[in-house]
Amino acid sequence: MPRKSLGSVSVDTTSDPTMRSRPERRRRLLAATVLCAAPALTGCSSGAPSALDPAGSGSGRVANLWWLLFWLSMAVFAEVMVVLAWALLVRRRPDVRVRHGQPLRFVTVAGAGIPLVILVTVYAVGLRDLAALGDEPGPRAPTIEVTGHKWWWEVRVQGVEGATANELHVPVGEKVRVRLRTADVLHSFWVPQLMPKTDLIAGEVRETWLHADRAGSYRGQCAEYCGTQHAHMAFLVVAEPRAQFDAWLARLAAPAPVPRTDAQRRGQEAFVRGSCAGCHAVRGTDANGGIGPDLSDVGSRWSIGAGAVPNDGGHLGGWIANSQTVKPGNYMPPQSVDAGRLPDLIAYLQSLK
């Protein structure tokens, strides 16, 4: 083993931890850093909506305030670390004595003055943004009425008779008023990329607004725990040019499409004459149920069960047969649908666009 000779004393350098190589200590420090950061990084997802990726004026203000707080916090953290390092590394000269009662200007400025400036700045910016978020749309702005149910969203447009579910459209570049109600428990309407949360409280009509700077589809979510399927209470906001928005309003007011194939006609008959019509409505037919979502445009929706599964034939068939296996606890009981009729029902529902 390598040894060092210090006068008449030999020292084993391999057994002394202070003599270990610097590369080894750096590798251990890097490994510890990775292990500590891994749990935090596992929560990141490129597909999840983020309030820090704003697509509207409302969320933009929230994101800017967040970044202001973040960088101010980083500055304070850096200041504290520098002072701490200085206190640990710089020793006081032995010939210097502390005079009790002397003015500590540094402590006064760093400990009271700087925090005061930060608090006043953040408070002023917060008040400015709060006032901007409270700036309501004009009287001619479209008004969308959203009602939260366990666990889906009913969507109507003021002045339009039809209804849809779990999907609302807005014109790009325009403010849209959103009136919120709950049919049961407390919910919270949140579109991270467009607007902060607004709670839905029983017996009250709450208002917020949406404004999208660019076209696209933005996922929203109930942000208040509301029971078993709270996680599967999502919705979609589709921002599109004004002409497409007007076309959506026209489709919302029109009767559902007429079946064009024999399978679709058989599916419509099974839907209207079966138990489906007791809970669901399809405009222009004898199905006028008001318990579950209106299915007049179900074929064009982005998902089934408010974000539970994709809207395709396989998932739709599974939902019809027994939605409890897909979204346990929802209010739709298992259906005794004849195996020969199930493809017809799927064909009919997929034609409703």
Annotate each PLM feature.
Residues 152-156, 164-241:
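Membrane-embedded segments
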Residues 250-262, 286-353:
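Extracytoplasmic electron-transfer domains, predominantly the class I c-type cytochrome c fold
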Residues 43, 224, 278, 297:
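Short, cysteine/histidine-rich loop/knuckle motifs that typically chelate Zn2+
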Residues 222, 267, 271-283, 332, ...:
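The canonical Cys-X-X-Cys-His
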Residues 1-172, 257:
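Extracytoplasmic entry segments of secretory-pathway proteins
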Residues 160-164, 243-272:
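Electrostatic cytochrome c docking/interface patches
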Residues 47, 225, 282:
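Cys/His-rich metal-chelating microdomains
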